[in-house]
């Protein structure tokens, strides 16, 4: 189930065994340690920036579903793409069905997608024509095509969340002004459902 070494597998088996979903919880935005979250750097956010992400950011989780930044979580390891059969479901996508989509889309019908494909497909396949699901991609141009690299994309996603919080972005067009890590908006590779930034 976990693609990891024995030490990490034992740690997470113990976490699930001893899990308490009601006490000792940590805000979700401070709990995740991946590159994307390191580049969001919520520890240095102002109160105004923290309020912004609480109102605008949704965190997708294979275990919890949709989290807001200050929702309390306990340590766990369960990727959305995990082949975990549950009663009547062959994997977590089938288990969650359209519940994540319903939660994310409920406010205004516009989603700026900064999730990896593994997570975003739990929402994108349910999007209706009247709704906007805009995927943001980061990469380098090679032979007229944009090539994405996993590590760089994770860092850039986190930087964009931070940029949006720092600048209190409410207008989609303002996202195009993102100029971090040498990235610039690439209109020639973008369309109404995709914003592409290249170096």
Whereabouts are the PLM-identified features?
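Internal, well-folded beta-alpha domain core
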Residues: 42-191
């Amino acid at each position: 189930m976990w693609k990891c070494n024995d030490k990490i597998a034992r740690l997470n088996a113990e976490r699930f065994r001893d899990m308490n979903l009601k006490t000792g919880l940590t805000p979700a935005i401070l709990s995740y340690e991946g590159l994307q979250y390191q580049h969001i750097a919520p520890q240095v956010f102002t109160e105004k920036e923290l309020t912004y992400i609480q109102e605008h950011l949704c965190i997708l989780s294979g275990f919890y579903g949709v989290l807001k930044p200050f929702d309390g979580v306990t340590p766990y390891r369960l990727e959305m793409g995990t082949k975990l059969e549950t009663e009547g479901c062959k994997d977590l996508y089938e288990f969650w069905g359209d519940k994540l989509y319903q939660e994310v889309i409920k406010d205004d019908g516009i989603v700026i997608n900064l999730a990896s494909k593994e997570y975003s497909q739990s929402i994108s396949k349910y999007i209706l024509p009247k709704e906007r699901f805009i995927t943001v991609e980061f990469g380098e141009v090679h032979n007229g095509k944009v090539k994405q690299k996993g590590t760089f994309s994770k860092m850039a996603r986190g930087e964009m969340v931070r940029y949006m919080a720092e600048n209190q972005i409410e207008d989609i067009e303002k996202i195009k002004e993102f100029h971090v890590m040498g990235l610039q908006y690439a209109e020639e590779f973008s369309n109404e459902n995709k914003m592409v930034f290249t170096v």
